[in-house]
Design a protein with these regions (language model features):
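N-terminal leader/targeting segments and the immediate start of mature chains
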Residues: 2-72, 130, 134-135, 265, ...
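Flexible, processing/modification-adjacent segments and terminal tails
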Residues: 20-28, 90-155, 194, 206
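One face of beta-strands
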Residues: 42-48, 59-65, 70-78, 87, ...
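Short beta-strand segments that buttress and anchor functional surface loops
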Residues: 46-50, 74-81, 142-149, 170-173, ...
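Short solvent-exposed loop/turn micro-motifs enriched in small/polar/acidic residues
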Residues: 56-58, 81-83, 126-127, 151-154, ...
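An acidic-aromatic
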Residues: 65-118, 174-184, 274, 283
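Short, solvent-exposed recognition patches
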Residues: 202-286, 294
């Protein structure tokens, strides 16, 4: 009887010791959730690689965040390795602002960016996920299932940490476990001192190229697409296309659009950006705001058409 009692006491002590150890040594994923709730600022830099229109794009990313008096401030700067085009997106008390080289002013959006979708360079996007944790030889891997409109072919992701719990790599995968996107983390700091003036977008920055003439944009390099009608209205140009799909483009010069644009999502392009509002998908590039209308096109197909827009001269046959 005494032996049984001793064993019971040992088991209780063992279970209690394990519980106490876990309580004093929380898992990495629990630490990240706590950090997400308590951090007041961060600085993050890295290199983003992804396949875009059958070409590998490499983008240098600088991402900063600050919380002050209950207000969240975000700053993201993207620079394309190939074109050296720079785009900046800022969230402050006034709203969301996008500035892209080639435009002489920032654009303001009514948007919940960046909280409305996953961003591999926004720490709150990563730290808030429901992870499973796996220990490896040189650190840990955190895995999570994600379903995002921004990355429709992505089904899951992994975040690699070294043995000191320093984040090194964020990878997104499709259902065939093929890597779709990766973000190599170069540096990041939690709770650094950041000047709030950083989150005020300066529209007086030097612009690399200014348009001297606004020309219509046409979807180039698309197979089985034919322009069937072109109508000039007082403020806009309406272009109707037929082919494998029917769609209409409405193009409006930038000086004719509202100063504040409502958007649920913003996608930065090499030479402009795309935004979504109430199922409408629009593109701002080359001095034009173009909205696409179609009943049988998927979101990805609309994006593909808008990213193919270029200035051209249409010659009637």
């Amino acid at each position: 009887m005494k032996k049984i009692l001793v064993w019971v006491i040992l088991v209780v002590l063992l279970i209690g010791g394990v519980w106490l150890y876990k309580d004093k040594h929380p898992s990495l994923k629990d630490n990240l959730k706590t950090l997400n709730e308590t951090m007041t600022s961060y600085e993050l830099s890295g290199t983003l690689e992804m396949v875009y229109q059958d070409a590998l794009k490499t983008i240098d990313v600088t991402s900063m965040y600050k919380k002050e008096q209950g207000q969240d401030y975000y700053y993201v700067r993207l620079e394309d390795h190939h074109t050296h085009q720079v785009q900046t997106i800022v969230r402050n008390k006034e709203g969301v602002f996008v500035y892209s080289q080639g435009f002489n002013r920032p654009f303001q959006f009514k948007s919940e960016w960046p909280n409305n979708s996953f961003k591999p360079y926004i720490l709150s996007s990563i730290f808030s996920l429901d992870f499973t944790e796996e220990k490896i030889q040189d650190g840990k891997i955190l895995s999570a299932v994600i379903q995002e409109k921004t990355y429709p072919n992505v089904t899951h992701m992994q975040v690699l940490f070294d043995q000191h719990h320093v984040m090194k790599l964020v990878s997104l995968f499709d259902d065939n476990n093929q890597q779709v996107l990766k973000f190599d983390v170069i540096t990041y700091m939690i709770n650094p001192e950041i000047d709030t003036d950083l989150f005020v977008l300066d529209s007086s920055e030097e612009v690399s190229s200014m348009l001297t003439e606004v020309l219509p944009l046409y979807p180039m390099h698309l197979d089985n697409v034919e322009l069937i009608d072109q109508l000039q209205l007082s403020l806009s140009l309406v272009l109707r296309y037929q082919g494998e799909h029917y769609f209409t483009l409405v193009e409006t010069p930038l000086d004719k659009i509202d100063d504040i644009i409502e958007a649920t999502e913003v996608y930065l392009l090499e030479d402009g950006f795309i935004y979504v509002c109430d199922q409408e998908v629009s593109c701002i590039k080359n001095g034009m705001c173009t909205t696409i209308y179609a009943t049988d096109l998927t979101f990805d197909e609309k994006l593909n058409i808008l990213t193919c827009l270029e200035n051209s001269i249409v010659i009637d046959s």
